[in-house]
Design a protein with these regions (language model features):
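Intrinsic-disorder/low-complexity peptide segments enriched for small residues
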Residues: 5-6, 95
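Structured loop/turn residues at beta-strand edges in well-structured enzyme cores
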Residues: 6, 43, 107
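C-terminal motif of bacterial Sec signal peptides marking the signal peptidase cleavage site
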Residues: 8-10
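N-terminal secretory signal peptides
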Residues: 12-69, 128-139
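Helix-rich interaction surfaces within compact, conserved domain-sized segments
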Residues: 71-142
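Sec-dependent signal peptide recognition
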Residues: 1-2
Length: 142
Protein backbone atom coordinates (compact mmCIF):
# COMPACT_ATOMS: atom_id res chain seq x y z
CA UNK A 1 0.00 0.00 0.00
CA UNK A 2 1.18 3.42 -0.86
CA UNK A 3 1.01 6.21 1.70
CA UNK A 4 0.23 9.57 0.17
CA UNK A 5 1.03 12.88 1.77
CA UNK A 6 -0.87 15.98 0.75
CA UNK A 7 0.13 19.37 2.03
CA UNK A 8 -2.53 21.54 3.52
CA UNK A 9 -1.70 25.18 3.04
CA UNK A 10 -2.53 26.43 6.46
CA UNK A 11 -4.97 28.98 7.55
CA UNK A 12 -3.03 28.88 10.81
CA UNK A 13 -1.54 32.28 10.24
CA UNK A 14 -0.83 33.61 13.70
CA UNK A 15 -3.67 36.14 13.32
CA UNK A 16 -5.32 36.72 16.71
CA UNK A 17 -8.52 34.77 17.13
CA UNK A 18 -11.83 36.35 18.13
CA UNK A 19 -12.28 33.57 20.69
CA UNK A 20 -9.75 32.17 23.13
CA UNK A 21 -8.11 28.91 22.09
CA UNK A 22 -10.01 26.87 24.73
CA UNK A 23 -13.31 28.40 23.55
CA UNK A 24 -12.54 27.52 19.92
CA UNK A 25 -11.68 23.95 20.92
CA UNK A 26 -14.84 23.59 23.00
CA UNK A 27 -16.98 24.99 20.17
CA UNK A 28 -15.73 22.31 17.75
CA UNK A 29 -15.80 19.54 20.39
CA UNK A 30 -19.47 20.30 21.16
CA UNK A 31 -20.35 19.41 17.56
CA UNK A 32 -17.94 16.49 17.18
CA UNK A 33 -19.38 13.00 17.12
CA UNK A 34 -18.00 9.84 18.67
CA UNK A 35 -14.51 8.78 17.60
CA UNK A 36 -14.33 7.07 14.21
CA UNK A 37 -11.55 4.85 12.87
CA UNK A 38 -11.05 6.63 9.56
CA UNK A 39 -12.36 8.98 6.91
CA UNK A 40 -12.08 9.04 3.13
CA UNK A 41 -9.86 11.75 1.77
CA UNK A 42 -8.91 12.33 -1.83
CA UNK A 43 -5.86 14.40 -0.89
CA UNK A 44 -7.65 17.69 -1.41
CA UNK A 45 -8.57 20.06 1.38
CA UNK A 46 -10.18 23.36 2.15
CA UNK A 47 -8.31 24.52 5.28
CA UNK A 48 -7.14 23.60 8.77
CA UNK A 49 -7.15 25.22 12.19
CA UNK A 50 -5.21 24.32 15.35
CA UNK A 51 -7.54 24.23 18.35
CA UNK A 52 -5.26 22.87 21.09
CA UNK A 53 -1.64 21.86 21.49
CA UNK A 54 -2.52 18.34 20.33
CA UNK A 55 -5.69 18.89 18.27
CA UNK A 56 -6.61 20.45 14.95
CA UNK A 57 -9.64 20.68 12.71
CA UNK A 58 -9.12 19.70 9.08
CA UNK A 59 -11.72 20.86 6.55
CA UNK A 60 -11.89 18.49 3.59
CA UNK A 61 -14.54 20.74 2.02
CA UNK A 62 -16.00 24.08 3.15
CA UNK A 63 -18.70 22.16 5.06
CA UNK A 64 -16.98 18.90 6.09
CA UNK A 65 -14.62 18.96 9.06
CA UNK A 66 -12.79 16.48 11.25
CA UNK A 67 -11.34 17.04 14.72
CA UNK A 68 -7.99 15.22 14.87
CA UNK A 69 -6.15 14.49 18.11
CA UNK A 70 -2.46 13.59 17.84
CA UNK A 71 -0.20 11.87 20.34
CA UNK A 72 0.52 14.09 23.36
CA UNK A 73 4.28 13.67 22.79
CA UNK A 74 4.08 15.92 19.72
CA UNK A 75 5.10 19.57 20.09
CA UNK A 76 2.40 22.23 20.19
CA UNK A 77 0.39 22.33 16.96
CA UNK A 78 -0.81 25.82 17.92
CA UNK A 79 2.58 27.23 16.94
CA UNK A 80 2.71 25.64 13.48
CA UNK A 81 2.57 28.46 10.95
CA UNK A 82 3.42 26.69 7.71
CA UNK A 83 1.59 24.07 5.71
CA UNK A 84 0.72 20.69 7.17
CA UNK A 85 0.23 17.34 5.53
CA UNK A 86 -1.73 14.20 6.25
CA UNK A 87 -0.59 10.72 5.45
CA UNK A 88 -3.19 8.41 3.99
CA UNK A 89 -3.42 4.93 2.57
CA UNK A 90 -5.67 4.32 -0.43
CA UNK A 91 -7.37 7.71 0.09
CA UNK A 92 -8.19 6.87 3.72
CA UNK A 93 -6.88 8.67 6.82
CA UNK A 94 -6.89 6.27 9.80
CA UNK A 95 -6.44 6.81 13.53
CA UNK A 96 -3.48 4.83 14.84
CA UNK A 97 -1.97 4.46 11.37
CA UNK A 98 -1.67 7.90 9.78
CA UNK A 99 -0.02 11.14 10.88
CA UNK A 100 -0.22 14.90 10.70
CA UNK A 101 3.04 16.18 9.23
CA UNK A 102 4.59 19.59 9.57
CA UNK A 103 7.91 20.91 8.35
CA UNK A 104 9.67 19.61 11.46
CA UNK A 105 7.60 16.75 12.84
CA UNK A 106 5.29 13.84 12.18
CA UNK A 107 2.51 13.40 14.75
CA UNK A 108 0.58 10.12 14.77
CA UNK A 109 -3.20 10.57 14.79
CA UNK A 110 -4.69 9.17 17.99
CA UNK A 111 -8.37 10.02 17.41
CA UNK A 112 -10.66 11.23 14.63
CA UNK A 113 -14.09 12.78 15.23
CA UNK A 114 -16.36 14.12 12.50
CA UNK A 115 -17.62 17.63 13.24
CA UNK A 116 -21.24 18.45 12.34
CA UNK A 117 -20.05 21.73 10.88
CA UNK A 118 -23.30 22.56 9.07
CA UNK A 119 -25.27 22.30 12.34
CA UNK A 120 -22.60 24.35 14.12
CA UNK A 121 -22.84 27.11 11.50
CA UNK A 122 -26.66 27.09 11.66
CA UNK A 123 -26.55 27.41 15.46
CA UNK A 124 -24.02 30.26 15.26
CA UNK A 125 -26.23 32.10 12.72
CA UNK A 126 -29.25 31.61 14.99
CA UNK A 127 -27.29 32.95 17.99
CA UNK A 128 -26.21 36.00 16.00
CA UNK A 129 -29.81 36.67 14.93
CA UNK A 130 -31.06 36.31 18.51
CA UNK A 131 -28.47 38.81 19.76
CA UNK A 132 -29.87 41.40 17.40
CA UNK A 133 -33.56 40.77 18.14
CA UNK A 134 -35.53 43.00 20.55
CA UNK A 135 -35.65 41.66 24.09
CA UNK A 136 -32.36 39.84 23.73
CA UNK A 137 -30.39 42.52 25.51
CA UNK A 138 -28.87 43.88 22.33
CA UNK A 139 -29.62 47.36 21.05
CA UNK A 140 -32.22 47.34 18.29
CA UNK A 141 -31.09 48.41 14.83
CA UNK A 142 -32.40 51.80 13.65
Amino acid sequence: MCAAIALLAGCASGIPLKESQPAVRERYAAYAGEPIRQFNWLGDYYSWEPVAKDELVVFTTPSEAYLLKVWPSCPDLIFVTGPIGLTSTSHTVSAGLDSVRTERMSCPIEEIRKVDYQRMQADLRREAQNKGSPGSGASPQR
